[in-house]
Design a protein with these regions (language model features):
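Well-ordered beta-strand positions
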Residues: 3, 52-55, 165, 187
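Cofactor-binding loop segments of dinucleotide-utilizing enzymes, especially the Rossmann-like FAD-
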Residues: 6, 79, 191
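Conserved beta-strand segments that form the floor/walls of ligand-binding pockets within enzyme
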Residues: 2, 103, 189
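Charged C-terminal helix
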Residues: 176
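Active-site-adjacent C-terminal substructures of enzyme catalytic domains
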Residues: 28, 38-153, 168, 172, ...
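Mid-to-C-terminal alpha-helical segments outside catalytic/metal-binding sites
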Residues: 139-143, 150, 158-165, 182-204
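Metal-coordinating catalytic core of metallo-dependent amide/deamination hydrolases
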Residues: 2-39, 108
Length: 204
């Protein structure tokens, strides 16, 4: 169950009620939190044992500590502040240095981030949120898989996992962040099956 806790959406108490009901029904919980204002959403995420909290643009040290103590994954979505022209991004460095696991995603949607380009998000993570290329790639792969409770199946190359693999036309991993939004994928495998070099969404 996912709830949006922010100004103009559910407040903290409403979010507690929604996620509490979801937990009683055996659902896992996550939420969109503190995108536009600090409304207690990070604290709610920690209290409710949310597997992840998305956005987190407006954060204080106590919010970061709460996420760390709860083991909640911070899913950072740099395409949204870019699309909205906000001029500020989630405090990735503070989260990482505090020991909060950080994931990275597009937040692709028609209103605030009409981009499907995860490579662009990796670039933004490095240029705007001061993550290293290695941190951004880990955030976009294995940490994102864990944010969906699928880290045991995908997100890294390990025996027993599904062979979801991208081979890049790049001399090293740093070039994934260096080229803004460029598709450097040379070959893509999903579940071990090779796709066309330039594939469409329907082929995936």
């Amino acid at each position: 169950c996912d709830a949006f806790c922010d100004v103009g959406a559910f407040d903290a108490e409403q979010t507690r009620r929604i996620l509490g009901a979801a937990r009683e029904l055996g659902m896992g919980v996550r939420l969109h939190a503190n995108e536009f204002a600090r409304v207690g959403a990070a604290q709610v995420a920690a209290e409710m044992g949310a597997v992840s909290a998305d956005h987190l643009l407006v954060m204080e040290p106590e919010d970061i500590d709460a996420l760390k103590q709860a083991g909640t994954i911070a899913v950072l979505l740099p395409g949204t502040p870019l699309g909205l022209g906000l001029g500020h991004y989630a405090p990735a460095r503070a989260l990482i240095e505090a020991g909060v696991p950080v994931a990275l995603a597009t937040d692709c949607n028609p209103g605030t981030c009409p981009s499907e380009n995860l490579a662009l998000m990796i670039s933004l993570a490095c240029s705007q949120m001061k993550m290293t290329p290695a941190e951004a790639i880990v955030a976009a792969t294995i940490n994102s898989a864990h944010s969906l409770n699928r880290g045991h199946l995908v997100g890294s190359l390990e025996p027993g996992k599904l062979a979801d693999i991208v081979l890049w036309d790049a001399p090293n991993h740093k070039h994934l962040a260096y080229h803004f939004g460029v598709n450097l994928a040379e070959m893509v495998f999903v579940g071990g099956k090779k796709l066309n070099r330039r594939y469409t969404d329907t082929q995936v």
